Structure formats: C-alpha cells, structure tokens
Amino acid sequence: MGIKLINIGFGNIVSANRLIAIVSPESAPIKRIIQEARDRGMLIDATYGRRTRAVIITDSDHVILSAVQPETVAHRLSTKGEEDEISEVEAQ
C-alpha cells in the first residue's frame, strides 16, 4: 500500500493515511480544539490568510486549518481512493 496524498489547497498536501476527521470550524467544540492545538504548538495553518473552511484532525494530534470546504477535501479523498483501486486492478 502506497502513500496517498490529498491536496488541501494552495499547494498544501496531507497524507490521507493520517487523517481522522475533516470538519467545519463553526461549532464551539471545534473552536476549542483549534485553540488547544494552538496552545500546544500542534496547529498547522494552511489557509494563507484566508477564511478557515475546513479543520483536519490527524492521528498525530495535529490540527490543520484549510481554506477549502470539507466536502471538497472529502471528495478529493474519495476520488483519490477510487483512482488507486482502479490502478491496482489494472496492475493485476
């Protein structure tokens, strides 16, 4: 199994194998998670100064802010998985 990478906007790429959740930043619990990650030094801001639209939580407890909609990131994740499955079938 190879490394799957997902584009989260502005040329920033995250390993799909490390993702736990892709959520909207609007709710109070998610805002609290963002602030706690900032305090711990585990926050990665990939928004380039734009509005945060998706919060990505990884298995290493890093919290990544993205300016791309959560649905877009999820779609990129699902289409990437389909492409990998197709290439694996063709290789057999």
Curated annotation (Swiss-Prot):
State the source organism's domain of life: Bacteria
- Annotated InterPro entries: RemA-like
Disulfide bond residue pairs: none
Q: Which residues form the signal peptide?
A: none
- Identify this protein by name: Putative regulatory protein CKL_1364
What the entry lists under Pfam families is as follows: RemA-like
Organism in which the protein naturally occurs = Clostridium kluyveri (strain ATCC 8527 / DSM 555 / NBRC 12016 / NCIMB 10680 / K1)
| Protein family (similarity comment) | Belongs to the RemA family.
